[in-house]
C-alpha cells in the first residue's frame, strides 16, 4: 500500500514539472505548498493505528514559509529577519507578528498581507523600501495592526492607506520631506509617532485628528518653527537638531498634558521666547541646551529638570526660578545644567541656595 502512495506522489510531481514553467519562484512556491499541505491524523480501526493523508480536495495549509522560522514556543510569530530576502514571503493566516527587518526588500505589492488579517505587528525596518514600490492598498485588510516599523529605509513619503488601528508608527531615518494633511487622517488610536531624522520642513495640519498621540519625535529634521495644531494629549515632544528660532507664547499653556519638551541644538534666542512661554505648572522637563540664549528663561517652580548647557548665558537670575524667595516659596528643580556657559560659581547669589533647596545636581 505504501508503495502505491509513493508512486502516486511521484506521478503528480512529474506531471507538475512537465506542465508548469521552470520559473524558480513558481517551483519554490510549489515546494512550499507540497511540504506543508499534507497534515496527517490518526484513525483507529480494530485497535490498530494507521496514518492517513487528509482529503486532497482541501486547500493547502502553509504553517511557515521555508525562508522563515516559526518557533512552536511562539506560534503566532514569524521570524524572517537577516536573511537577505528581496521580497515579502507568504504570511500564513494564523500569524500575528512578522519580523522582516534587516533584509534587502525594495517592494511591497498589494495583497501581500491579505491572507493574515490578524496581523498586529509588522517589522520592515532596515530594508531598501522605496515609496514608489509600495502598493496603495498594502495595509488595507489589516484592521488589527497596532505597530508598524518602517524606519531605516528609502521612503520619501508616508505610505497610503495606513490602518486606523495603528498605535505605534516608526518612519524615522528615511527621506520624507513633506507630509500631506490626509496622511494620518482617521488614526485616532495612534499614541506614538516617530519621524526623526528625515527632511521635514513643515508639518502644516498633518497632525490634526491624532487625538490619542502622546509621543511625537521630530528630531533631526529641517523645521524652522514648532509645528502647529499639536495633538491635545501630547506629553512628550522631541524637537532637537532642527532650525527653530522662536517659540509661540501659548505653546505650552494650551497643552496642559505636555510634560517633556526637548529643544536642544536649535537656534533659539531670548528674543524668540516670550516672557512666560515656559512658565507653566504642568511641565516636568525642559531641554534648551546648545542654543543661543544669553539669559535664563522664566520657568515654573514645578519644573524638575532644566538643561541649559552650551548657551551664552552670563548671569544667574534667581527670579527666573523663584518669584518670591523665603522658607515657604522655592523651586522643585532637581537637576540644573548650566555648564559650558559664561557663569562662574561666584556669580550665583546667596539666595539661590534657598530657592533651589531641592536641587541635587547643579552643573556650572
Segments and roles (model prediction):
Residues 90-92, 111-116, 133-142, 159-165, ...:
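A structural signal for leucine-rich repeat
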Residues 59, 65-70, 76-77, 87-89, ...:
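Plant-biased, solvent-exposed loop and capping regions
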Residues 77, 97, 107, 121-123, ...:
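Conserved LRR concave beta-strand detector
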Amino acid at each position: 500500500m505504501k508503495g502505491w502512495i509513493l508512486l502516486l506522489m511521484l506521478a503528480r510531481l512529474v506531471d507538475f514539472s512537465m506542465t508548469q514553467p521552470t520559473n524558480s519562484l513558481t517551483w519554490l512556491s510549489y515546494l512550499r505548498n507540497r511540504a506543508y499541505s499534507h497534515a496527517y491524523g490518526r484513525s483507529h480501526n480494530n485497535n490498530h493505528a494507521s496514518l492517513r493523508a487528509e482529503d486532497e480536495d482541501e486547500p493547502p495549509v502553509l504553517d511557515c514559509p521555508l525562508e522563515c522560522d516559526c518557533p512552536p514556543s511562539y506560534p503566532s510569530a514569524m521570524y524572517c529577519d537577516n536573511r537577505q530576502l528581496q521580497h515579502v514571503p507568504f504570511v500564513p493566516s494564523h500569524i500575528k507578528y512578522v519580523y522582516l527587518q534587516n533584509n534587502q526588500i525594495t517592494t511591497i505589492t498589494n495583497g501581500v498581507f491579505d491572507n493574515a488579517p490578524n496581523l498586529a505587528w509588522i517589522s520592515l525596518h532596515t530594508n531598501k523600501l522605496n515609496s514608489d514600490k509600495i502598493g496603495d492598498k498594502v495595509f488595507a485588510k489589516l484592521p488589527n495592526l497596532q505597530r508598524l516599523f518602517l524606519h531605516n529605509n528609502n521612503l520619501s513619503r508616508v505610505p497610503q492607506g495606513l490602518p486606523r488601528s495603528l498605535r505605534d508608527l516608526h518612519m524615522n531615518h528615511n527621506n520624507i520631506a513633506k507630509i500631506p494633511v490626509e496622511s494620518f487622517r482617521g488614526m485616532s488610536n495612534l499614541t506614538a509617532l516617530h519621524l526623526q531624522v528625515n527632511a521635514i520642513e513643515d508639518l502644516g495640519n498633518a497632525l490634526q485628528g491624532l487625538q490619542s498621540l502622546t509621543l511625537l519625535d521630530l528630531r533631526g529634521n529641517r523645521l524652522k518653527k514648532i509645528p502647529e495644531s499639536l495633538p491635545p494629549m501630547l506629553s512628550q515632544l522631541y524637537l532637537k537638531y532642527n532650525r527653530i528660532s522662536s517659540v509661540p507664547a501659548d505653546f505650552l499653556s494650551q497643552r496642559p498634558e505636555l510634560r517633556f519638551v526637548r529643544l536642544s541644538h536649535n537656534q533659539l534666542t531670548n528674543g524668540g521666547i516670550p516672557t512666560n512661554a515656559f512658565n507653566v505648572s504642568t511641565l516636568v522637563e525642559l531641554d534648551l541646551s546648545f542654543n543661543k540664549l544669553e539669559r535664563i528663561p522664566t520657568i515654573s517652580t514645578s519644573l524638575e529638570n532644566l538643561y541649559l548647557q552650551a548657551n551664552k548665558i552670563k548671569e544667574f537670575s534667581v527670579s527666573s526660578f523663584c518669584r518670591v524667595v523665603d522658607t515657604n516659596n522655592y523651586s522643585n528643580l532637581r537637576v540644573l545644567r548650566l555648564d559650558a556657559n559664561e557663569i562662574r560659581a561666584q556669580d550665583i547669589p546667596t539666595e539661590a541656595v534657598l530657592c533651589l533647596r531641592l536641587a541635587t545636581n547643579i552643573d556650572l
